[in-house]
Amino acid sequence: LLYVVDLNKEVSDFERVSLSGYVPENIKSKGIEILNKLAKEIPQEIKINTSIEIGFPTEVIVEKAKNENYDIIVMGSRGLGKIKSIFMGSVSQYVLKYAHCPVLIVR
């Protein structure tokens, strides 16, 4: 399970300059909470690893999947709608296009 901290959304420009690889505790706690909640929904016989990364979610997901030789990427979709997705793009669309492995998008 992977939680990507998108610092562009989580912190101001001033904070971003001073962070340089550091994840503020409140953001890290939020990620851990989300990962733990998701991990409880996965059957115990399935081995999982959890990870919190920093960066652009699109690039982090694709690179991590490639570097760790993922068999499949399963991810959610925010459902931006047709108009918003045209202007804002979509993490799931990017991953679907650039991932080296199959991608399953769940609504």
PLM features: what roles do these ranges have?
Residues 63-107:
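Gly/Ser-rich helix-loop-strand patches that form or flank binding pockets
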Residues 1-18, 41:
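Small/aliphatic-rich secondary-structure junction motif
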Residues 8-9, 60, 82:
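Generic structural signal for helix capping and beta-alpha/helix-loop junctions
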Residues 36, 40, 93:
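Active-site phosphate/pyrophosphate- and oxyanion-stabilizing loops and adjacent acidic/basic residues
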Residues 19-33:
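A short acidic, glycine-rich active-site loop
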Residues 40-73:
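Structural beta-alpha unit
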Residues 2, 49-53, 104:
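General small-molecule cofactor/ligand-binding pocket signal
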